[in-house]
């Protein structure tokens, strides 16, 4: 401190002196103001708690000195203590050695001359220091931590303690303490968790902090268990521990002192210690660890199992036993030896012992030794056994048995010796001297029971005598009784006698018996046991056994034993009723006895009921008051001394108690429910028996716990008696009988067929017996019974007549039997009002006058609906009106238009009647044919062909009904006279008339939904008319010139038919045979001969080959060779291509085929049909059945022509008479019609017409109109059911033949939406009807043919029959032979398939069926316009899953079908068949081009759309404009503008610079906008060679950005503009459209596809996106759409359909 003060003083003094000098130098100068600007001063500690650093910035230039002073400040803010001073000329100064955290006052003085000093006073504080000695340790609790620290040097205001959970970084505690606090305890912490503690020292706003980490202690497990798993493994278990991150296990071997440790992760609560020492105690300790903490938990002690000793051997030694073994692994506490046998002994040995001696003398016998090893609480033991024989007990000094042989001859000869031999040994066994005079010889130490020979030899070696004998055998060992299996048997056994023997002998004697011992039994040497039989039960016997060898016996062994007493015999247990008790009886057993032991058990549950000891004389015993219905068992045994015999058993029952509260109820006509209540006691089962009139009907056995049962299949309405019996074993007790009735049977369904005024009620009764009961049908009106009628049980049908039409009543059937009655549910009969009758339509040009008769009944109004028929078979709603009258005028209609009128009556019960529909056409306004039409064209040939042109009589020629050809030989007539139509060929040929009507035929241009021909050529003079005076196209007179005129007959329903004539044609000469060249005639003759020979050879070959199958019997044999050769069957995979090819050029190929078929079969005889008696039976005079195939009815007596009906057998696919085709019945042929049905066993009738159309009756109503049957001849027809649907009606009839007394059911299927001479609206409806027909035919049991009819039985009938046959052919042969099928049909019935439209429609149906594919294929294909939005939504579902699936099919089809337009096999077409024409493709290069290559493709547009030529690649002006001219293009579309960076293309002419090529010259005419605002350029193209000109409209549409599709509205608007351009001009056929794109082929593909799809939608009302995309992709791979573009086609088309097609839906216009 002193140096600082001194330094400060020196600095001050120096400054003072300097200031004085300065002030001296300023004397005489002006005074300056005192003070000056302040300094900018900054104070900091520079990170040091004992320093303060001052820095400043002077406000004035120039060097000044600075004086600084520093003093500490107390808590009240007053300076105190020693002042520190300093002086400097720098801009900063640092004070050292200050107190941390203390406040100081600083003064900074700027020393300026003349004492104008400036002083600044500041207060600052030094930074505090951190605490010292910070510690954080456990406080003895898992949830607490204790923190402690020492004071921080210097001053401070407080300490802040922040405790964080380290893992989650969450704050656990935040507390501030005073500076005097030096410790803190944290509680409620998580055990086993690491925390960080921050201690912050605060001094004002300054702070210093330090931190420390620490863990809380974990919670050790409170339970530990140790379990032995074997000799070397222990398993430890413990419960969970809170906060432990791991567990330390220490297992201590308490014998060896070794430790085994393991560290277990958290979450595991078990561990197995392996490879331990067997038989060793172990102590386990567990420690829970968390961080540095290890907390020991409980301990456990357990032993391992001891290991087993091995090689235990028990050896007999004389009269003692010796045991030895090998010790097992590991440790043990000792051994326990337990010897059992004739003598028992237990001893213990130390753990180190391995042998033991059991000292003798031990009695002989079988001994077993159990050696048990002990280790703690566990042991392990093994056993060994051996036999101890008596020989082992012989004294050691006895060497063996002794042989004593007598019979030695006495001799005094010295030196004699006795030589001993054995039978088993080859040499001498002994050699002893024989004393003189000895008479016996003795050998010792021999084998007992053995045979020996002794030779007596002299001193010279001579044998003087040989003697032999046996040693005495030893007795058998261990004689004992081993079994007493029967009271009269004892089984004894013994051990083999030592040595040798020849056998054993056994004898026995009963104690107390005066008889001698029993029979002696001699046994072989190997027998060691014997069963003594037929002994007296309950008696004691002494048994002796010994061994023998030779004549010697061993000592006998004796044993004393007793037989067991015999059990009592014939024990029985039964129930005695007088008195009521359970009684046991028995007979005395043989043998001895002292008493009887008697026990009685109840078996369920097993309970001892009684136990008695009865005297030996007792033979029965009884028990009273036992539980009823229980099974008991008695056990009886004989007592004799301490012995007890086996038990004799017998069972018996106590009778059960009868059930109570028996109740019988009926819930159904064939059921009875029986219930009862249990009574106390037991039972084994219940038996419930059902009786009907004392006859047992059924029996049911129930379990003892059941309290009810049901009887099924009973007779309804019948009284029954029920008996319930409770059984207990063989005993039973019956309850009182109970009687009950079953409910009467009622119909389970009432089927009501309603007609106006009556109802047929069919009662469906349940199957089975009807039973008894009385039934009534009841009608109620407004809840009151109004009518009742008795019914018979099982009655199936009854009629309700005179019901009020339009009224509602309720009906039920009620039946009663005994006290029970049942009723069906109420059936509400809402009687349908009858239909209107006598409907008459009076047509006019602009209105229809309608009259009818209202039906009787409770009716209200009549609803009249008017619909206009539109082309294609559809209708357009016009209006509807309700009226209560019977006449109505329908105004404001269109002339010559067909309307469908539907009249429906509304009853007051809100029921509508059956609609009566009729088609009525307004009449035409006055038809004004030309006065004289242009003459027809005549074609020359062997005959003459007159060509009739469509429109030759004006645009209203659709009103023409018939055309006629008038021929004349008058060369001066300008036009025919009206009288000419009255003359025929007969008048001309035989009577000399110049002009005559040669031919009359219906209008071939009748409007159809399919395209018709533009001209019709008919041959004249082709028929051989003989003498017929009718209109006949007879041969013309040779050598005459003829002129021809066409006459038209109107279709007006006026009294006088309007006629129109054409001018006569130029004269043409008829060709006579006389002028035909000879070579031509000879060629014709030879050709005819060759054809005849070929046919004869073919027939001969068929005869040799044998008959064909029925299926092919009518295929080709009657067909001209050239037709069969030309028209082959079409394979299924090629059918679509064939169809599209035949559809080209206005169905020209179809027309040619149909023309070829017109004359088929016409020359076949029809004599029976033309007979005068039968003419009136034909509906149309030109539709007559051929004789060879007509159906013949049974001829009626006296009526030779009654077998005729206008019907033919038609061969089906598999049978020659599979189908009958007939006309719709006339009133006069109704009886014949039903005779046909009955005699031919027809079960299915197909009706393809309505009864009336356009006011014309097409077919009589030949079935009952309601439930009232009708009779025709002997056949009565009942209408059983009628089910009308949208497009067909199903009916079922019952036919009853009056004379044959037989019944038969016939089903009728009527297709109601097929107009006469026309086709249905769509193939799908007819195909669905065919499937229904096939199902009904298969379900019909009858084998008769199918009957098909329409009106004439040829047009619609022929189409339907051909479709049936061809569908079978498709299924069986995978081909379709349409032409030959129709050919065969026409050979059997004329005019089968009557119109060209029907012929084409037949092909359409087959194509639709082919494209349907398998039933389980995908649902892509042609989609109806009405269903398109739903189809789009279905495909877009699940992230466009449907689109993705269909697009994959498209890619596969493109890959697989390189040349085929058929979709892949799993591709499915549904709904309406697409009629897109085949694509004709040509290319300028062989492969699909890149952008620099050129390719052109042609897409024909069909009859109503324009042809479309697509040009891709870089086309020059020559290629482009010459292609425009060659393809007669009138509209040119250019997609995409050229790149602005490239040179403008030179394919477009400019105003003053036309384009000139070798073929054409192209001029720009004008530029304008189309009506829709699209830029358009008009060009004039001049052909150089011919000079012809043509105007070409060019629309240029800029494409969108690359990779983006145009907005749907933009593309649709552009297509509309293109369509307007295509259809300009007078031609009905639009001009060709040529589209060109040099680069954007994808967008060109989208443009082309949308153009084709919109045309489909407009013309066909279906769209086929799949096939359109497939065709384009096969035409050019660059136009293959991406998945996004494919989805775009759907979305764009859906937008067009939802918002209306372009041009108000008239899309046939677009190209």
From Swiss-Prot:
Originating species: Rattus norvegicus (Rat)
Purpose: Protein tyrosine phosphatase that acts as a regulator of energy metabolism. Prevents decarboxylation of osteocalcin (Bglap) via an indirect mechanism, preventing the hormone activity of osteocalcin. Functions in signaling pathways during bone remodeling, as well as serve a broader role in cell interactions associated with differentiation in bone and testis. Associated with differentiation in bone and testis.
Catalytic activity: O-phospho-L-tyrosyl-[protein] + H2O = L-tyrosyl-[protein] + phosphate
Binding site for substrate: 1316, 1350-1356, 1394
Membrane topology term: Single-pass type I membrane protein
Induction annotation: By parathyroid hormone and cAMP analogs.
Localisation per UniProt entry: Membrane
PANTHER family associated with the record: CYTOKINE RECEPTOR (PTHR46957), PROTEIN TYROSINE PHOSPHATASE, RECEPTOR TYPE, H (PTHR46957:SF10)
Stretches in topological domain Extracellular: 18-1074
InterPro entries, sorted: FN3_dom (IPR003961), FN3_sf (IPR036116), Ig-like_fold (IPR013783), Prot-tyrosine_phosphatase-like (IPR029021), PTP_cat (IPR000242), PTPRJ_TM (IPR041201), RTP_Phos/Ushers (IPR050713), Tyr_Pase_AS (IPR016130)
Listed EC numbers: 3.1.3.48
Protein name according to UniProt: Receptor-type tyrosine-protein phosphatase V
Residue span(s) of domain Tyrosine-protein phosphatase: 1150-1409, 1427-1696
Family that this chain belongs to: Belongs to the protein-tyrosine phosphatase family. Receptor class 3 subfamily.
Tissue expression as described in the entry: Bone and testis. In the latter, restricted to the basal portion of the seminiferous tubule.
Positions of transmembrane segments: 1075-1095
Keywords, alphabetical: Glycoprotein, Hydrolase, Membrane, Protein phosphatase, Repeat, Signal, Transmembrane, Transmembrane helix
Keyword Glycoprotein set for record: yes
Glycosylation: residue positions: 42, 74, 89, 117, 174, 239, 259, 431, 570, 620, 649, 663, 737, 851, 882, 970, 982
GO cellular component term of the entry, any: membrane
Enzyme category, top tier: hydrolase
GO aspect biological process, one term: cellular response to epidermal growth factor stimulus
Cytoplasmic face residues: 1096-1711
Pfam families xrefs: fn3 (PF00041), PTP_tm (PF18861), Y_phosphatase (PF00102)
